[in-house]
Structure formats: structure tokens, C-alpha cells
């Protein structure tokens, strides 16, 4: 379904046919202009993506059982610099703006009294593909693999030994 999740009316109309939906996996992201310099610019749009999506599907489907919110290590402040590792789900929120906090707070409040539940996943890296975004390492690895093959080279890890031997979590 092609839908502008920032438009609540369009989201409601186009997702209305999901009356048999039982699970929602939400991993949408809208980078804001200048967001790297001012992370607070991401908050409203990314909260609204979740609000419009979940509100529409909650309205459409009486069979909804669970919403899975995919966040990430920015919850712990990874975008601000080094953070305590291993990170734990019960770690306190970092100081400063973070759209994950707004999403979690909204989803917690919206879900109260509803017959469905929700969970949050926090992978270190989320790989995937969406047109117009450079948020995935997969296309770069694919190009590296294609060039290696074309040159008759074996596919080797393109980083340092420390990165190769590190424990890391990736979700697709």
C-alpha cells in the first residue's frame, strides 16, 4: 500500500482495508532537514508517522493483537557520542531531544484500555531499502561485492579487525 503516513486523512483512508490486520511492524523514519545538527527537528514528523499509522489501523481492525515499534540505539544516546555498554532496556533516558521518547510515550498512552499490546525492539543497525534514503549499509555492501566480483577478487571484510571481531546486532 503506497500511503503518505504524514497525512492522517490519507493514512486512515488507505489503511481502512486492513480490517484483518493482527500485527503492525512500525519502522518508518522521516529525516528532518538539518536534523543532524538539531535532532529536535525529527520529533514531530516521526511521532506523527506512528500516530497516523497506528491510529488508522486501530480504527480499521478489530483483530489487532500487537504493534511492534522498531527504534534503535539512539534511545540510549548513540547519536550523541559514546554511551554505556552493554545498553539495557531499563537504562534511563538520555537528556535531550529524541523522537523515540515521544513515540513510546504516545503509544503507551494510546494503547491503554485497548485489547492489543505493543513491544519495542532496539537493534543497533536497521538494514533495508527505501527509495531516496541512504540509511542502509546494504547497497554499499552490494556495490562492494559487485566490484570485487568484477575484478576477480575474493569478497573480504571491508573494515578493520576490531570491527570484524566486535559483537554487533543488525536487523533487516
Residue ranges and their predicted role:
Residues 38-61, 68, 96-100:
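Short alpha-helix in the Rossmann-fold core of NAD(P)-dependent oxidoreductases
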Residues 2-48, 52:
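NAD(P)H-binding glycine-rich loop region in Rossmannoid oxidoreductase-like domains
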Residues 52-65, 103-117:
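A structural motif corresponding to the C-terminal end of an alpha-helix
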Residues 142-170:
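A conserved pocket-lining segment of Rossmann-fold NAD(P)-dependent short-chain dehydrogenase/reductase
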Residues 106-135:
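Conserved beta-loop-beta element that borders a ligand/cofactor-binding pocket
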Residues 33, 72-82, 126-129:
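Conserved catalytic-site region of short-chain dehydrogenase/reductase
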Residues 43-47, 85-86, 92-105, 134-138, ...:
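Short-chain dehydrogenase/reductase
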Amino acid at each position: 500500500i503506497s500511503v503518505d503516513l504524514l497525512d492522517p486523512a490519507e493514512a486512515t483512508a488507505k489503511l481502512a482495508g486492513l480490517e484483518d490486520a493482527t500485527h503492525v511492524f512500525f519502522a518508518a523514519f522521516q529525516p528532518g532537514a538539518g536534523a543532524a545538527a538539531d535532532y529536535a527537528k525529527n520529533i514531530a514528523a516521526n511521532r506523527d508517522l506512528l500516530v497516523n499509522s497506528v491510529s488508522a489501523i486501530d480504527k480499521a481492525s478489530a483483530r489487532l493483537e500487537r504493534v511492534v515499534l522498531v527504534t534503535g540505539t539512539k534511545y540510549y544516546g548513540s547519536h550523541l557520542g559514546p554511551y554505556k555498554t552493554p545498553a539495557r532496556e531499563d537504562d534511563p533516558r538520555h537528556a535531550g531531544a529524541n523522537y523515540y521518547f515521544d513515540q513510546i510515550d504516545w503509544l503507551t498512552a494510546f494503547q491503554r484500555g485497548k485489547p492489543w499490546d505493543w513491544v519495542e525492539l532496539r537493534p543497533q543497525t536497521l538494514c533495508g531499502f527505501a527509495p531516496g534514503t541512504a540509511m542502509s549499509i546494504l547497497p554499499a555492501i552490494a556495490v562492494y561485492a559487485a566490484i570485487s566480483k568484477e575484478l576477480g577478487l575474493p569478497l573480504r571484510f571491508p573494515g578493520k579487525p576490531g570491527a570484524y571481531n566486535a559483537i554487533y546486532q543488525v536487523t533487516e
